[in-house]
Amino acid sequence: MAEQDSNPVFQIQRVYLKDVSLEQPNSPQILLEQSQPQVDISLAVNAETVADGIYEVSVTATVTTKVADKTLFLCEAKQAGIFEIRNLPDGQTQPVLGIACPGIVYPYLRATVADIITRAGFPPVHLAEVNFQAMYEAQQQAAAQQQGAVSNGNGGSPIITNA
């Protein structure tokens, strides 16, 4: 029985849409513009401890589309998942939270963003595939450099915040 309790556990408890918004602050006038819109997309990953061995991982996408420096539309969506992660070898929980969990949540986010933008009457914006391992490694490197420059005593990884 004790052997079962020490086996590694990784389970998806739930994937859900946590937040979504779409704004068209300059409609309807801007819809008459003939200029090609400029699209800016940003992504953020966050992980929080919900309970012992239970984590919420969210991926947020912000799509800002402008025509001649005026916002055509702004879409922001946050897709989240609740994961049970227990008994992983030392040092493995952070990479799972920063790489595997966002990779599970992200396809749902991509579909939501494309759907919301299409329902608003625009051609869909398809978010590109993301290499969450490269993103995680870049965050870790940036955090290490920042800690080297300014020792703030936090320690650990920036990916997890406690609720």
From Swiss-Prot:
It is found in: Cytoplasm. Disulfide bonds: none annotated. GO terms for biological process: protein folding; protein tetramerization; protein transport. Keywords: Chaperone, Cytoplasm, Protein transport, Translocation, Transport. One of its GO terms (molecular function) is unfolded protein binding. InterPro entries: SecB, SecB-like_sf. Its main location: cytoplasm. One of its GO terms (cellular component) is cytoplasm. Belongs to the SecB family. Homotetramer, a dimer of dimers. One homotetramer interacts with 1 SecA dimer. HAMAP family: SecB. One of the proteins required for the normal export of preproteins out of the cell cytoplasm. It is a molecular chaperone that binds to a subset of precursor proteins, maintaining them in a translocation-competent state. It also specifically binds to its receptor SecA. This is Protein-export protein SecB. It comes from Methylibium petroleiphilum (strain ATCC BAA-1232 / LMG 22953 / PM1).
